Curated annotation (Swiss-Prot):
UniProt name for this protein: NAD(P)H dehydrogenase (quinone)
GO molecular function, one term: NADPH dehydrogenase (quinone) activity
Annotated FMN binding sites: 10-15, 78-80, 113-119, 134
Positions annotated to bind NAD(+): Y12
Source organism (scientific name): Rhizobium rhizogenes (strain K84 / ATCC BAA-868)
Keyword tRNA-binding: no
Pfam family, one: Flavodoxin_1
Catalytic activity entry: a quinone + NADH + H(+) = a quinol + NAD(+); a quinone + NADPH + H(+) = a quinol + NADP(+)
Length: 199
């Protein structure tokens, strides 16, 4: 049984919802799944004034524990076309894991969100993949076998690089059914590949 970590950062709860959908998918594929989040860097008074969702039940992860898992699925919103600084800061503390090769051969995958359709979802995922590759991880995306990412009948996130959701500038749009299904599919897909690698 593969051990899968869904590691996320969510300011307003959109990525949190996606993270639990990813976890559901991974569990459905037989994985042992843990959901954790990275620490908030914004001062609490600023976060409260900005209406951040601070009541998230997932425990805080530490960089060293990444080595305990067979697959790590990373989720964070885009900030100006790249990953949110909270997630970047967390991974910038993994030099010891890199030096000792603790993540080599593990599966890595990424999902994201943005305020608009063209707000940097693909650039965020593609910009984070080199971090996984530098750690020697095997990168897995969201294949077109998930047909939900095809078509133009509705506004939706998702690409072969990973699941994603669109939030609107005011955060009023929640992940749609098809976006959550994409997240579940990605979680299951990663878990199945990780299980083959650890068999």
């Amino acid at each position: 049984m593969a051990k899968v970590l869904v590691l996320y950062y969510s300011a307003y709860g959109h990525i949190e919802k996606m993270a639990y959908a990813v976890a559901e998918g991974a569990k459905s594929a037989g994985a042992e799944v843990t959901v954790k989040r990275v620490p908030e860097l914004v001062p609490e008074e600023v976060a409260k004034a900005s209406y951040f969702k601070l009541d998230q039940e997932a425990p805080i992860a530490t960089p060293d524990e990444l080595a305990e898992y067979d697959a790590i699925i990373v989720g964070a919103g885009t900030r100006f076309g790249t990953v949110a600084s909270q997630m970047r800061n967390f991974w910038d503390q993994t030099g010891g894991l890199w030096f000792s090769g603790k993540l080599v051969g593990k599966v890595g995958s990424v999902f994201t969100s943005s305020a608009t359709q063209h707000g940097g979802q693909e650039s965020t995922i593609l910009g984070f993949i080199p971090t996984l590759l530098h750690h020697g991880m095997a990168v897995v995306g969201l294949p077109y076998a998930f047909a939900g990412q095809m078509g133009t009948e509705e506004v939706k996130g998702g690409s072969p690089y990973g699941a994603s959701t669109i939030t609107n500038g005011d955060g009023s749009r929640q992940p749609s059914e098809i976006e959550l299904e994409a997240a579940k599919y990605q979680g299951a897909h990663v878990a199945k590949i990780a299980a083959k690698l650890v068999a």
